[in-house]
């Protein structure tokens, strides 16, 4: 288990670029965090965190692909879900390419 500041490190991905997140997790030799993002027909989003993140350092990787507004809301809702799940720190990683 990779640790950061003595805490477990977890990496989650939004829907924008799962391949990039998987490559980062493979490099770090850790599994990608389990989460589910549901987009409803009325464009509302629901994010479910599928594992324990209590007292972990969590990184969320989300690129700004189209539709940008939806991807940013997805990121913010995921951060909120992680904080409500008692993650110690949540860091957003937004690569731009």
Task: Set out the residue ranges of the language-model regions.
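PRPP-associated nucleotide enzymes
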Residues: 1-97
């Amino acid at each position: 288990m990779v640790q950061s500041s003595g805490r477990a490190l977890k990496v989650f991905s939004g829907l924008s670029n799962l391949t990039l997140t998987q490559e980062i997790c493979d490099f770090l030799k850790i599994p990608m965090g389990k989460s589910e993002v549901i987009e409803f027909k009325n464009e509302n989003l629901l994010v479910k965190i599928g594992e324990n993140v209590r007292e972990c350092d969590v990184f969320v990787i989300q690129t700004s692909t189209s539709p940008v507004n939806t991807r940013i809301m997805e990121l913010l809702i995921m951060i909120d879900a992680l904080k409500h799940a008692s993650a110690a720190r949540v860091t957003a990683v937004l690569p731009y390419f």
